[in-house]
Amino acid sequence: MTDLQTPPQDIIRGVRPAQRAVNATLQSDGVNLVLDAVSEEEETDLLALVDAGRWDCSLSRRVQHYGHRFAYSTKTCVPVAEPPPPAFTRLAERIRPVCWGADGGRDGDLQCTVNEYLPGQGISPHIDAHGAFGDGLVAVTLGAGCAIRLQRNRRHEAGAPIHTLWLPPRSALVLSGAARYVYTHGIVSRKGDLVDGEWRLRGRRVSLTFRRLPPPGPCACGFPESCDASGTAPKLLPTRLRGSAGGAEPPGCDAKKTVCASRVGVNIPGGPNKYKT
């Protein structure tokens, strides 16, 4: 088993160390990291609530959608029958001032996606579709921590630096302004992260991602060069759909279990055995 303090060099070679603090560049572009956004007790309750729900197993990892879900075929949000649970809306309201402002948002526009990341799973760098969601997104980390990769869209800014930020348990990552509309965000598919000079094996991480629907009318993001709604930029979406799934659950997947059988011992394409930055 890999030692946490002295991992083999062939594993960590090329892995970018994760920073604990948001640097000045990220801060000015709209990145904020709220530590201890939820208490340990609240984290336990939220995880129990999530695991009592029904998982969608049609993607490369398990997800749940509340309020609305993103439709990959039309690149828009469509309503779902189940609204966000009261515990989710209370959490979103608590975070509202730091992301959307005290008066931000409209009744019924809150969308929440629950993502489960098992060790070795990740998500490719992407920008949330401008036409589907408004400014400001919040990702609350439950369970294990993880490193996230942030970078300005290289299509318009060649050589833009890569920022790797450590998301500790119970933290809330806030992306607004340029960080939401111009930066790609993603999680490298690997089984550990380099933090404080130590190789930290990943555990099960559950992310609660809160977004709001955009106001009616054309996108007013203010970043036309990166706008996939009213501008010319292509949609930088995560490559996480199963090519032949057709929305069906993969064999061995039980939507009510904590871990799908189809996930155990499976090498996700480009995933568990890849340790690149």
Which residues does each PLM region occupy?
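Non-heme Fe(II) oxygenase metal-center motifs and adjacent flexible, charged/small-residue loops
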Residues: 1-260, 265, 270-277
